């Protein structure tokens, strides 16, 4: 029979080995820049995570049923999922402001001008390059700012090309994913909606149903001003609801939210891999 002191020592050693293994595994899975130490970032880059993902959220009224930080909250979940699926990326802190403008009638928006938004993204991208990242991907969860992100990426990609550093704009996380989801909704008989409608409300229900992102008791009455088809003029005699919702969000569900979330992640990962092919 082994001495008790040996058994205790052996158990302690096994515990320490298990703890070290768990810590190392956690570090390998971590992709959230603001939740990492500088040593963990350096180790991750050395292990191949050399792409920085800069995702822009936004603070904006989202109808009576959704919290104002929806773009940023969804953006954080989206960019973390993209980074994990890529396997070669780290997610920078999500930007909480977009190209937009406040409105006293619906006091939930904090916006930036286009030039300031572009300058902010340019400086953050260059900071990530100074940190040692070899690729930077710019993305946005809000329609305002897409043009500026494309321009910044083009400018910095040219500036750093001689150093072998790439800066690219992933637009399909917004444009393609939303277009594909709209087609799905139309094909399955859902009503038209955009801002604070079925896409936004459903995704926030899926990601934050238990976190207070959506006032669930208000979804059943989440009906805004009717959507107009492309080129269709607004009826001057129609009464405006003006509650921040564009269209009808009443049929929003977490299941639909899961679908649009996965569409965004898949579209982004596919495009990023095309923009930054493995060497």
What are these regions (language model features)?
Residues 13-25:
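Bacterial N-terminal signal peptides
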């Amino acid at each position: 029979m082994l001495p008790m002191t040996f058994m205790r020592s052996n158990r302690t050693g096994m515990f320490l080995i298990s703890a070290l293994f768990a810590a190392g595994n956690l570090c390998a899975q971590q992709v959230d820049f603001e939740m990492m130490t500088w040593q963990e970032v350096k180790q991750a880059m050395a292990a191949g995570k050399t792409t920085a993902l800069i995702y822009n959220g936004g603070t904006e009224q989202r109808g009576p049923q959704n919290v104002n930080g929806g773009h940023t909250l969804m953006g954080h979940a989206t960019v973390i999922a993209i980074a994990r699926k890529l396997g070669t990326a780290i997610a920078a802190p999500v930007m909480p402001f977009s190209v937009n403008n406040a409105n006293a009638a619906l006091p939930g928006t904090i916006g930036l001008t286009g030039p300031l938004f572009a300058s902010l993204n340019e400086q953050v991208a260059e900071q990530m390059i100074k940190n040692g990242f070899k690729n930077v991907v710019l993305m946005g969860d809000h329609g305002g700012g897409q043009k500026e992100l494309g321009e910044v990426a083009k400018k910095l990609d040219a500036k750093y090309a001689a150093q072998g550093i790439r800066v690219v704009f992933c637009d399909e996380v917004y444009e393609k994913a939303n277009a594909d989801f709209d087609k799905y909704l139309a094909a399955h008989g859902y009503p038209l909606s955009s801002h604070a409608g079925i896409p936004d409300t459903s995704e926030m229900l899926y990601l934050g149903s238990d976190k207070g992102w959506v006032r669930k008791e208000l979804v059943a009455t989440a009906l805004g001003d009717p959507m107009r088809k492309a080129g269709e003029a607004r009826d001057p005699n129609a009464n405006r609801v003006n509650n921040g919702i564009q269209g009808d969000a009443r049929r929003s569900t977490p299941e639909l939210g899961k679908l649009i979330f996965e569409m965004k992640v898949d579209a982004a990962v596919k495009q990023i891999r095309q923009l930054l092919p493995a060497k």
